[in-house]
């Protein structure tokens, strides 16, 4: 109760104490919302009866794949260009978003600004947002998460710890406190959702870093204290225990490109669905993390690494020199055909929507080339990249023979010594909160209702279609 009372006080006061950079963010959001409000009104008035898609029986039994049933503002997946963050491609984001001094990768806080407002922030706005996030770091809230994580069984998965940590932070929710106190309404829900989102973005890096130390050393604590002089990704890297500037750049890239991926994937849709019940952003994001923890969603890069390690063992056993490009290409071609002919798939290749090389893969590959990676794992993944599309086209059983983001992300982390594969999904979640929380705030800003689709039964379908066909 004490935490709830404190949250009520902070929640009501927090909106009055907004910094100038937060005022700028809100101003941009309100301006765009006003424009969208007119568009939405016109769309519903003039075209509300138009069909977006046909929901076939195959589709409802097939995980609703291909059914257009959601409006999600932060990003859109283009089958030709890949993910677009507020209309910008990955390459455009890399070129246009503010960077750290001397760096080439976008700052994740700049990406968050873009996802939240729809506008590219200035250097000053990106720095101001970083300062705002540092201001919101609350030792008391982080200590609550630390205590909750420390109470878990030793064999608890890092994603279990992350979800529990976020739920512990929830006791400081300004959205929940204001709602309980009767201080919020439909017109102000979005502001409290934004407050919670900023607080969460400020506090989850420390929670994630403590989980890493728990995984590597058995202690739920930071490897190094937070440093308010550093940007969001660099400070996270420091709390993990990595001091190398090149690794900081790696984290800026990794956390930026994984920030969002449209609204229909499990973690984004779960977060959106739970938040539609006016559950606060902490509850919603924790639910999204639980979806992300599923092996069909967040574990793909680990599957790729298992595949690469198995290839590495075969290459070694066959006496192939990974630095002999021709010999390596010949060996990997042989192994790949054996894999495909046995009925298995190549992890990291193919995509449900995209029909070209995933731009997120490309930017990671370019990072490795720019920093002159020479380790065996990169040699493997790079050679596979050169030969795989041709093999898969010849095999003829895939619509997209090109690599996706998961084909490379684990290789980056392995190179810098972050080898704990069970932890990788925590990094994914830390990044993905930027997109899904922006989506939650915009749902509240646009006044979206409780999500409640209609369900049917097999018996009902059988009576309607099978009985009439007999």
From Swiss-Prot:
**Which PANTHER family does the UniProt record give?**
CITRATE SYNTHASE (PTHR11739), CITRATE SYNTHASE, MITOCHONDRIAL (PTHR11739:SF8)
Query: What is the designated name of this protein?
Result: Probable citrate synthase, mitochondrial
Q: Name one GO molecular function term.
A: citrate (Si)-synthase activity
Give one GO biological process term.
carbohydrate metabolic process
- Protein's cellular compartments: Mitochondrion matrix
> Remarks, anything else?
Citrate synthase is found in nearly all cells capable of oxidative metabolism.
On subunit structure and binding partners, the annotation says: Homodimer.
Q: What is its EC number?
A: 2.3.3.16
Q: From the UniProt record, list the reaction(s) this protein catalyses.
A: oxaloacetate + acetyl-CoA + H2O = citrate + CoA + H(+)
Q: Which residue ranges does UniProt annotate as crossing the membrane?
A: none
**Active site (record annotation):** 297, 351, 406
Alphabetic keyword roster: Mitochondrion, Transferase, Transit peptide, Tricarboxylic acid cycle
Q: Which CDD domains match?
A: ScCS-like
Q: Which organism is it from?
A: Leishmania infantum
Pfam families per UniProt: Citrate_synt
